[in-house]
Design a protein with these regions (language model features):
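Bacterial N-terminal signal peptides
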Residues: 9-17
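Surface-exposed patches in mature extracellular/periplasmic domains of secreted proteins
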Residues: 141, 152-160
Length: 203
């Protein structure tokens, strides 16, 4: 067995083993091999069926961050393959440039700022916005740190709060964790952020 295949096989086995452990939290992990192989995987430890479906989206799609009013509009630069949660929003995906995005639960999330009138971005399309527009983590961070929109996060179909945080990794293994805490976006970027779970927030 050659080295790249062996490395990928070992990493996939490790990720698979995480998914069968008895846990109460979703976990996302990125493996960076000695030959710069980058593999990202996650578990989905949720209390019910998320009714997920897989979708393939081409580049050139017209998008809106919200279904009415003051919102963000864009045309997708990159095609992507995604998994939808409750079949209404993008939870996980990878675009054609190798950018991977994963949305996980974070009870500490607070999106709201008093008197905030920035354009609205629905939590259900936030992940897709990143996949549509950015080829690398650095590109995404440079834009998202401007905080040019606010997140609207209605409750999930089962009544749970949509308190979520986002992790993105590019083909180099660079990763960013994005969390809304007290109405402000906190970004942690670097190859050292290889694991993300639910609570607590990053410090």
């Amino acid at each position: 067995m050659n080295k790249p295949i062996k490395t990928i096989t070992v990493a996939l086995a490790a990720i698979a083993s995480m998914s069968v452990q008895q846990t109460e939290a979703c976990t996302r992990a990125t493996y960076i091999g000695p030959d710069n192989t980058v593999i990202t995987g996650r578990t989905m430890d949720w209390k019910e069926d998320l009714m997920s479906n897989i979708y393939v989206f081409p580049r050139g799609m017209q998008r809106a961050g919200y279904n009415k009013g003051n919102t963000v509009n864009w045309t997708s630069k990159y095609g992507s393959v995604i998994a939808a949660g409750y079949d209404i929003g993008t939870c996980d995906g990878m675009n054609e440039k190798g950018l991977v995005a994963s949305l996980l639960f974070l009870p500490e999330s607070v999106y709201h700022r008093p008197g905030d009138n920035r354009p609205i971005m629905g939590i259900s399309i936030w992940t897709q916005y990143v996949l549509d527009n950015f080829a690398t983590v650095r590109e995404a961070v440079d834009e998202l740190k401007k905080e040019s929109f606010r997140i609207d996060a209605p409750d999930l179909p089962n009544g749970a709060a949509s308190t979520l945080h986002l992790a993105i990794t590019d083909e180099t293994g660079n990763t960013a964790v994005l969390e809304y805490i007290d109405g402000n976006l906190e970004i942690h970027e670097g190859k050292q952020y290889q694991v993300m779970t639910n609570s607590p927030k990053y410090e």
